[in-house]
Amino acid sequence: MFLKRNRQTAKQKPLTMKDNRKKKTIQLSAAALGGLFWCMSTPLHAQEYTNFVLVNLDDVGYGDFSCNGAYGYTTPHIDSLAAQGVRFTHFLACQPISGASRAGLLTGCYPNRIGFAGAPGPDSDYGIHPDEMTMGELLKQKGYSTAIFGKWHLGDTHQFLPLQNGFDEYYGLPYSNDMWPNHPQQGEVFHFPDLPTYDGNEVAGYNTDQSRFTTDYTERAVKFIRKNRKKPFFLYLAHSMPHVPLAVSDKFKGKSEQGLFGDVMMEIDWSIGEVVKTLREEGLLDRTLIVITSDNGPWANYGNHAGSAGGLREAKATTFDGGNRVPCIMYWEGHTRPGSICNKLASNIDLFPTFAEIAGAPLPVRKIDGVSILSLVEGRKNADPRTSFVYYYNKNDLEAVTDGEFKLVFPHKYVTYEAYNPGNDGQPGNLANVTLTRPELYDLRRDPGERYNVIAQYPEKVIELNKIAEKYRKELGDDLTRNKGKERRSPGKKHAPVH
């Protein structure tokens, strides 16, 4: 039961940045009015819509759910959704670092297309550009109530905060929970100010006890669902955990066999269980798509305070698959096939157009990179909507490209977690800098851990993947080959005038 998606015509004249912002505003205003009249004239039971619950975890690796092989703790609520829904095995975060990954998730774009890089902190001068349509704004076109509880990371000044970018409610952190005065390297490497917790546009406190966050976010999520039970809603639950520093409430302290990290994961699983229970109690489970994923792989040099990449190579902040490949589970009663596994290539930037298709919301005028993966969610035969993915990192380095079966890695510098032992109990271990001097090719079908270079055996694959890379170098550029790219847009800048 889908609302038909509005499609833009090929002859539509491109808008300027200023015009596009007006267009975005007009779309939202018109949609709000249309939704008002629709609600006034149509009985609630006759309205057909799908709610969206998007749970985006922080630094959860591919192997950190028990259905993916986690050890020393269990995640029964997550596992139950996997058993009833679809588990993706080749789901890639658009970049292996928090801020950029979240910017891509919420706009459907490779982060470098929208000028977004890295993990902005309290001293950063950039954030989400006002002309970029976020997932919140996308769904508000169709009358959705929207909320984010948790980590934002798309900029920390007023113009960048959620309430100015498509969300009705916000409670949480503007950036990572380690960007505070209690950082283990404070005064040596970092000089962080006090960490604000926001409630809407106002600071509710500084350096909040982080053991409260998972429970606080969950309670607000439950309240939001109950308040909006009779109308469409989008809940973005962006837990601050298990990013370091780890913190857990008393009710889960000491519960796992894997120490504090396991305790934190058990509490996150409880949180997801509370959300599912609320949806069931309100009779909404059959009209809600639930997505559980992570922003990037684990921060492996934190040792027993870090997650597991599940045997994949390297971890967060690298474009080997330990950094980009993340768990993803989707459940949508009546649409996902119980216990199904999807091995097809997909990315977090694909959620934006997927939600748009389900909600019948028009896509933004500005170009996006995501493709709808609704066909994969529903398990349609021979569905294969994403045929390639490019791995960008740093400001604009194109480090690798894949077609889902083979991955071509280009020469680049990266940090390795494999040269030193990891740290422990909240202290990070050392990292080593490595330079890859020649391209390498990996057969991900047989070697998902990227250990065996088969570039000599598959010269035709190298040619195919290089063609894909060249296409993106022309569009988005590549600092490694000194290509500027013709289709990159600018991020928002602090204190920049908004027209």
Task: Tell me what each language-model feature is.
Residues 1-25:
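N-terminal secretory signal peptides that target proteins for export/translocation
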Residues 18, 28-33, 42-440, 448-467, ...:
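Formylglycine-dependent sulfatase
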